Regions:
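Zinc-coordinating Cys/His ligand positions in small cysteine/histidine-rich zinc-finger domains
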Residues: 3, 11, 23-26
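Cys/His-coordinated zinc-binding microdomains
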Residues: 7, 27, 290
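Short metal-binding segments enriched for Cys and/or His
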Residues: 27-36
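The −1 position to Zn-ligating cysteines in a subset of zinc-ribbon hairpins
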Residues: 2, 22, 285-288
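Cys/His-rich microdomains that often coordinate metals
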Residues: 10-11, 30, 105, 293
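ATP-dependent adenylation/nucleotidyltransferase module used to activate substrates
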Residues: 36-268
């Protein structure tokens, strides 16, 4: 295995103990960088709502300047976070394109809201269905039967799937060690049909194909770093706007917002969100998703 940064071969003696992707020198440098990034994220989170709106508009504008208005799109879920993002983006670019991935596992209230946005609120939305490159339609049932059920969290489900599908004994043992270190309490579920592939098959892959088909180059997402460990980690590594660094160009201009900011914005600007939230739900997501059941 090679150091992620300097590509030096990693051994028992030169591997950084807290992050085994790095040698000691690079790991120490990276740790310092992440520590400074964490301070930056804290400062951004402490800003008032008006300042956050200004910063969010700046980040959206950067994406449009970098790629062109006809090459960017709002990845729209119909939830309150992406609806706030849409409201801000449309105040700048009224006709900005929205792509909505209908996973076939949506709440009826979400579908109703999408219909309202398109037909009554004038939002430029294209609905994307989960059809793969071969033209086959995927459903939640098909994903579960083929790969397994989405349970606990994406990290846990991914760890279990990696363990189950290891191609060598060494990989299987490494996966077992990873489960032991990070998810000991879920080890008893490691032989059950659990996977993190659901979102890939029903949402991410169809959106990527549609974006490529339309010649789009950058997704603007309404995700918050506070929503999960992985999203915060991702922000610490890359920040809000990630251009020309990874497989997909992304702008995540709400990353430093929190749920309180979202609710305050909705109230201040009288933003319409799905009736789902009036029924006691805190998120929209997919109806039968098992991520979060451990919380």
């Amino acid at each position: 295995m090679l150091c992620k940064k300097c590509m030096k071969e990693l051994t028992t003696f030169n591997t950084y103990p807290s992050d085994r992707r790095y040698c000691i020198a690079c790991g120490t440098e990276h740790s310092t960088y992440i520590s400074e990034r964490r301070k930056t994220l804290t400062s951004l989170r402490e800003m008032n709502l008006e300042s956050k709106i200004i910063q969010t508009k700046y980040l959206i504008r950067c994406a449009v300047i970098e790629f062109g208005l006809d090459k960017v799109y709002i990845s729209y879920s119909g939830g309150k976070d992406s609806t706030v993002l849409s409201h801000i983006a449309k105040s700048m670019y009224p006709d900005i394109l929205h792509l909505f991935a209908n996973t076939t596992n949506e709440y009826p209230e979400t579908i109703q809201h999408i219909k309202w946005e398109k037909e009554e609120n004038g939002t430029n939305i294209i609905t994307v269905l989960p059809i793969d490159a071969k033209g086959d339609t995927w459903t939640f049932k098909k994903v579960v039967e083929t790969y397994g059920y989405p349970m606990f969290s994406k990290r846990v489900a991914n760890a279990i799937r990696t363990y189950q599908h290891a191609l060598s004994e060494r990989t299987k043992q490494n996966s077992q060690d990873y489960l032991d270190r990070n998810f000991k309490k879920y080890e008893k579920y490691k032989e059950l049909p659990i996977s993190d592939k659901c979102c890939d098959k029903l949402k991410k892959e169809p959106l990527r194909r549609k974006a490529k088909q339309l010649g789009l180059e950058c997704a603007i997402l309404g995700i918050l770093a506070s929503e999960s460990y992985q999203r915060e980690k991702d922000w610490l590594e890359y920040g809000c706007n990630v251009f020309h660094e990874r497989k997909d160009n992304q702008s995540r201009p709400l990353s430093f917002w929190n749920d309180k900011d979202i609710l305050e914005y909705i109230e201040r600007y009288d933003v319409k969100i799905p009736k789902l939230y009036d029924m006691g739900y805190s998120r929209n997501g997919c109806m039968y998703c098992g991520f979060g059941v451990h919380l």
